[in-house]
From Swiss-Prot:
Recorded family membership: Belongs to the LTO1 family.
Lineage, broadest ranks: Eukaryota, Amoebozoa, Evosea, Eumycetozoa, Dictyostelia
GO biological process: protein maturation; ribosomal large subunit biogenesis; translational initiation
Name this protein carries in UniProt: Protein LTO1 homolog
PANTHER family for this protein: GEO13458P1, ORAL CANCER OVEREXPRESSED 1
GO cellular component, one term: nucleus
Length: 139
């Protein structure tokens, strides 16, 4: 009778060992897929922040050139090409980007990124400068 019980338990033993092996394989595969996804998202995040930083650098340079030209023209404020609000928002955006660090343990990293995105759009509109986002139609 013992032999018959062992024969019946073969199926359940195979089920249990297969389940454990599947869990181990799933953990391993999940780690690899998670690593790849994190790597891709990290690259996208870095590209986005780099784009914002490069735009802000160029805009700050344009504002400084504009200010130098205005100072050479007898301080005539009517020659301003950029709005005061736009320049103020550019300063705030510059500060946000300087303070932004890619610390993935920080839970507010995405909140700060969305704040940078909003400030970037607002600043580009107020300064009247073209960006790649403005080139695309939005319906």
């Amino acid at each position: 009778m013992k032999e018959f019980d062992q024969l019946l338990s073969v199926e359940s033993d195979a089920y249990i060992s297969s389940k454990e092996q599947g869990i181990d394989d799933g953990k391993r595969l999940g780690y690899v897929e998670g690593y790849q996804l994190g790597f891709e998202k990290g690259i996208e995040l870095g590209q986005e922040i780099g784009y914002y930083q490069s735009c802000v650098t160029v805009w700050n340079h344009l504002v400084s050139i504009n200010n130098n030209n205005n100072n050479n023209n007898n301080n005539n404020k009517n020659n301003l090409k950029f709005s005061v609000r736009g320049i103020q928002n550019l300063e705030k955006l510059t500060k946000l980007l300087e303070d932004y660090h890619l610390d993935f343990n920080d839970e507010n990293i995405m909140n700060t990124l969305s704040e940078i995105r909003l400030k970037f759009k607002l600043t580009s509109v107020q300064l009247g400068l073209q960006t790649k986002e403005n080139d695309e139609l939005s319906f």
